């Protein structure tokens, strides 16, 4: 399964782009509206975290700027009545931390802002999100999460994707970011993995 893709933009679609790799293969990648609207020009480099969905009749790639977005997409598509297109619409309307904030504030009505989601569907989705989205106990009621919170969640979802628990990951992440708060996601993730491997 494809989880990461890097290449240059060969073509644009209405809700997607074609990413050509150095091997000469082009992949159509479906994107959230914000990501699609901020793509660079043809021929320029892009990289996405990929959710590769395989069905009987088709394979599709969905691309995200952060690992947190990808993992949230996977959570959303695991909810009954939420397909890949609905999940993509949700992430076009809300960033992952915005969705967590909706859960914290029990703001079911906010979900109806997403195209194709009515009140009953919003209630159903909300109930499942309460148990499936990772909520940090220190989250605030601000609707605009800080860069630090976003970085924390990106690293956390990355470590959980590698099999580490939320509890052990959180301790290591806080330790790493306390000493080096300016790290990017990739560097911080590597630091955390080193600490976890050392035990």
UniProtKB/Swiss-Prot annotation:
One of its GO terms (cellular component) is Holliday junction resolvase complex. Residues 1-65 are annotated as: Domain I. It is found in: Cytoplasm. One of its GO terms (molecular function) is ATP binding. Residues 147-199 are annotated as: Domain III. GO terms for biological process: DNA recombination; DNA repair. The keyword DNA-binding applies. InterPro entries: DNA_helicase_Holl-junc_RuvA_I, NA-bd_OB-fold, RuvA, RuvA_2-like, RuvA_C, RuvA_C_sf. It comes from the Bacteria. The keyword DNA-binding applies. Residues 66-144 are annotated as: Domain II. It holds the Pfam family HHH_5. Keywords: Cytoplasm, DNA damage, DNA recombination, DNA repair, DNA-binding. Residues 144-146 are annotated as: Flexible linker. Its main location: cytoplasm. NCBIfam families: ruvA. Belongs to the RuvA family. The RuvA-RuvB-RuvC complex processes Holliday junction (HJ) DNA during genetic recombination and DNA repair, while the RuvA-RuvB complex plays an important role in the rescue of blocked DNA replication forks via replication fork reversal (RFR). RuvA specifically binds to HJ cruciform DNA, conferring on it an open structure. The RuvB hexamer acts as an ATP-dependent pump, pulling dsDNA into and through the RuvAB complex. HJ branch migration allows RuvC to scan DNA until it finds its consensus sequence, where it cleaves and resolves the cruciform DNA. Has three domains with a flexible linker between the domains II and III and assumes an 'L' shape. Domain III is highly mobile and contacts RuvB. Homotetramer. Forms an RuvA(8)-RuvB(12)-Holliday junction (HJ) complex. HJ DNA is sandwiched between 2 RuvA tetramers; dsDNA enters through RuvA and exits via RuvB. An RuvB hexamer assembles on each DNA strand where it exits the tetramer. Each RuvB hexamer is contacted by two RuvA subunits (via domain III) on 2 adjacent RuvB subunits; this complex drives branch migration. In the full resolvosome a probable DNA-RuvA(4)-RuvB(12)-RuvC(2) complex forms which resolves the HJ. This is Holliday junction branch migration complex subunit RuvA. The lineage of its organism: Bacteria, Pseudomonadati, Thermodesulfobacteriota, Desulfovibrionia, Desulfovibrionales. The gene is ruvA.
